């Protein structure tokens, strides 16, 4: 079988010694109602939801949908999760926290946080001065926000849990406003504090709580800047059309690439830490570390949503993922590959075609080096874990199992952990769930955080299944379900609702009503249930834990 064709290896793009590919994730479920060219867009990291709000600065045809402006939250598959009628004011920027809360910054300095189901969970203001001077630019990161006023004052909050506005040094009024703004988050900055990068004139100013540093650059004006996910590199688009990459301490010039376009891109983002991606109308350009490049053409508007290991590309109809091909996948499927992993896949193909040469291929793998067959098995398992296509996952697992049968010392743990991981990943990638997370993203996010996000979207049954498969503590899921059931109790009496919740809890764990459910019950005027919950916390009855699932 031509595995290169099956895997799309013919369409991989090579930038220097690295391969990149673009994979379709979903045909988006939101239909023909969305025109991204007229929208403000914010995508949550780790394959999270997408928030859309009509951009008031863009000219739109007057229709029923444009007259009814709303802030909509969709899953990555385009399924509507929440619709928030929007009458709050002018939006400067939107972003997402590490807890998957949508952050909306208004031009009067107000900051609003929404849950994925559209509830306003927090709001605060950065100061009265923004009511006069207004917010000029804003940047949002996973735990905070910073705003620049039209009077060039910088105010930030570095912890949404305790939103205390803090001031940075005020800029002396420049000849022209900053052309762009970026941040190095505290966890990535050498100083361990927030650093703000402002492109002003020909240079960049670095601002932190200690002061303002002029980096004495001469390449400006810079039209776009973007900080690498590891915080160590800065990509810039210059006024004369160069993509310029430098270190964030401004000590090294890493690369320059002429795009031959003086029109700035609509977006400039990083694809992992190896390359940068630029978007102009109907064109996406990827530039590698040594000047190699590849262009993708489109006939509809796009938005680029950067991830730790690639870039999600959403259009009016599709979501795709542009990323570096994992080394194990290259090893197995690169055209002409003669690696142990590639030969093991060939051996499986021969076996399934009843070709007697399969055993000869296994013998050849063994003769490559002393550990060739084990290497081939491990490579196939690693490639399967990174693969998005389920039939290819299954084929790679069969190849690994076939190779393992010839090993004298078999270790089933890696096979078991890989199949369990893929079971979990495939479950959350279903379009009804809409969480197309990769193995690399899951390792950075952690399985426990993914389960928490599923619970927040009310996918409690799937969250409990993942807890069972991945051997995670199910109590946070159960607690969240209980609180949500109280909030959605409707006309059910306190006593009846209490019995229903307790019966479900007994089927899953030895927990009674969680302590903070009393506050949830009081918030919906269920005083009797709140009192019962507090009594159970003070004197918890004995319960027998049984392995079961909420239905």
Question: Which residue stretches match the model-derived regions?
Answer:
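WD40-like beta-propeller blades
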Residues: 1-275, 279-308, 324-345
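Extended non-globular scaffold/tether segments
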Residues: 2, 8-26, 30, 253-260, ...
